[in-house]
């Protein structure tokens, strides 16, 4: 739709603590040969290091070792450079934790592709642990967002006696395009592993901030 309107969209990534964006999904002309679905998949990545940033890496936060560039192994995005904050105001403990190992710990979980492009999978605090399996809430949200009746999706952990936690989806529907809980669960089963499929779907108007982010 954006292409039809003549807009060229580029994904960038950054945090308040890094004074602007530190990666950008710079386009490679060779990708023009790919079909639209593949191009959109690439455009969803956060990208490669921006020139004003000294270092971007995806690491195991426990060992501070970079994860394999296989597009599958999840680690935490680490950032280094003079664009990174000095620390949190009057909070030495939080500063020490965030800067452990000489890198800023973003709290964003991501994979690194073989071409050096980063793609976020989830926030570390939003990972759902179900029966010992780590589930990305973003992966489920992105799947639900592909359904024509879904306007916005938010997935959270729901306590479960058997599995500890299970995914629960909150859905804001597209006007005049009704859909049932059963239909959305079946839709998710087409592409997601069984343990990742939401066990409950709640339809509601999702609360948002003034900038449109889901609260």
What are these regions (language model features)?
Residues 3-12, 16-117, 124-127, 140-141, ...:
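Conserved AMP-binding/adenylate-forming
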Residues 10, 201-204:
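General small-molecule cofactor/ligand-binding pocket signal
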């Amino acid at each position: 739709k954006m292409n039809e309107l003549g807009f060229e969209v580029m994904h960038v990534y950054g945090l308040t603590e890094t004074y602007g964006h530190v990666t950008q999904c710079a386009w490679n002309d060779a990708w023009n040969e790919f079909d639209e679905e593949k191009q959109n998949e690439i455009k969803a990545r956060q990208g490669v290091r921006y020139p004003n940033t000294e270092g971007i890496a995806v690491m195991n936060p426990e060992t501070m070792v970079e994860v394999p560039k296989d597009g599958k192994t999840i680690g935490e995005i680490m950032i280094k450079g003079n664009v990174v904050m000095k620390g949190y105001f009057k909070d030495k403990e939080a500063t020490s934790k965030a800067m452990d190992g000489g890198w800023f710990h973003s709290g964003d979980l991501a994979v690194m592709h073989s071409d050096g492009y980063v793609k976020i999978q989830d926030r570390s605090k939003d990972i759902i642990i179900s029966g010992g399996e780590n589930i990305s809430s973003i992966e489920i949200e992105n799947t639900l967002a592909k359904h024509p009746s879904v306007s916005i999706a938010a997935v959270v952990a729901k306590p479960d006696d058997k599995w500890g936690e299970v995914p629960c989806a909150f859905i804001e529907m597209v006007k005049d395009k009704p859909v049932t809980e059963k239909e959305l669960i079946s839709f998710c089963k087409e592409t997601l592993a069984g343990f990742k499929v939401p066990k409950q779907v709640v339809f509601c108007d999702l609360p948002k901030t003034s900038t449109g982010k889901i609260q």
